[in-house]
Structure formats: structure tokens, C-alpha cells
Amino acid sequence: RYWFADPFLFERDGITYLFFEAFDLVECKGKEAYSILCEDGTWSSLKVIIDEKYHLSFPNIFEYGGKMYIMPEMSEDYSLKLYEAVSFPDEWKITQDILSDVYACDSVFIEKEGVQYLLTNEMYHNVPNGQYASCWVKNYLYPMKGLKVTGDGVKVADGDYGIRNAGKTFISDSKLYRIGQDCRERLYGRGMVLFEITSLNPYKEKKVKNWSCEEIAKHIRSNHHGKIIGSHTYNFSEHYEVIDFSSFQTLSRRIEILRKWHNTKRNIYRILGFVKRCCY
């Protein structure tokens, strides 16, 4: 009934949670769901936790001020809302409207040295050069305080190469990084691009590395026969990293836990390779 995408990991009290989009093939829309890593290495049955009348994806989960939040993608509603856990991880409520009248997708929360920003991708209604709306986007940076937007957004980039977010931002060796999607050739998630954010005000970033689907496929253990045609979300936690992919063989989307990390002080991240011990 479902295929899966947009995985986010969260570890709490010794339990590893995997939050993801569960696309319901019967209802033709995405829902937010989670699964728990069991002691034998398997995953519990999925549980849907947020189901709206419109499509949901990219369940960006994070902790702030001792509370748990999810900031999903809900572009079909032309809004961006923040959900707060009433009873983690099963019960959630809308706690505020972050943005309205926006065609926004895959938004990430940035906090560095006490300063907060929202970096969101806004899709075009009239896409240039025959591109797909999901591929060609504009990046807007909004100032925030206490998880509330405090000013107008500033467009910082647009295009199809690395502009659309592909996971959370993270800090490594005091450097702030963003991972984006390579959507060139009118292909959604053709690869991934890593950027270092060198300045937030004004916003500046520089490309560090990029990976094609073929390169990403080398790190995925599932029996995909090298026929991966898309990968567009990558995240990690203290002990795990996770990635989604679609394959030509099955025309389905899957989530892959790449490896469990036993020594977190190594250069541990298989996809990011050179990046040392990281945190959000």
C-alpha cells in the first residue's frame, strides 16, 4: 500500500526512531509515519502519525527547548506549519502557522550561535525552460526567533542544481553544511550536492562535493543491481545514517540504513566521507 521517502532519524532515551513519508497508493497522498529499530536489527511496523487532507512529506523532526517538533512539507496546502508532540512519538498537534500563501517544500531550520533562520524552497508556478516544478526551485531565507518568522524572506538562490534541500543542515568542525538535490536533466533527485554555508547574513555558500546516483548506489547494500535512478534525502543521527532511493528495477522508493556506527569519533559518515563527528 505504501512506498517510502524522505527519511529522518532521531535517537532518544536509547531508542532509534525513523520518521519518513509514507505515500499511500490507495489515497494517492503522503502521510507522516515512523518506525522503531528493534533489538534484533529489524524495524517495527510503520505507524502513521500525521494525516491531513493534502499531501505531506519531508518530516523534518527536531528538538527545541525541551520539546519535539515536526516541520513537514505541505506545499499542496500552500502553507508551512509546525507540529508539536503532545505525546512523543504518537500524538502531534499544529502549534503554529510558520508561513502562508507560499508554495514551499523541504524546509529546514538553521540555528548557529543563537541565531535562527528558516531556509525554505519555493516552487515556481510557471517553471522556466520546461523544467518540472519539483526540480526548479527558489531558496528563501527567513529570520526567526523562538521558532517564529520575524521578517520577510530573502531569495538567496534559484535553479535545479543543489538548490532544493536534501536533508537537515548540520555542523562539523564548527562549519555549517547544507545538502541539496541535483535535479538537472529534469530528473528529481538525480544526485546530491554538499555546500558549506559560509555566511548567513548575507547568505553565502560554496560547493564542497557532489555525488551522482551511480556514486550513491555504491554505498547502498540492497539488491538494486546498480539501477538506482533517484536519491533525494540523506540524514544521520549519532549512530546511523539513512538515505532514500528509487530504482529502475522496482519503480519504487526505498529507505536504506547504511551502517551502524560503533565508534563515533572516527570519520564515520559513508556518504559524506571526510566529515568528522557531526551534530545538528
Identify the residue ranges that each predicted region occupies:
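Carbohydrate-active catalytic/glycan-binding domains of CAZyme proteins
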Residues: 1-280
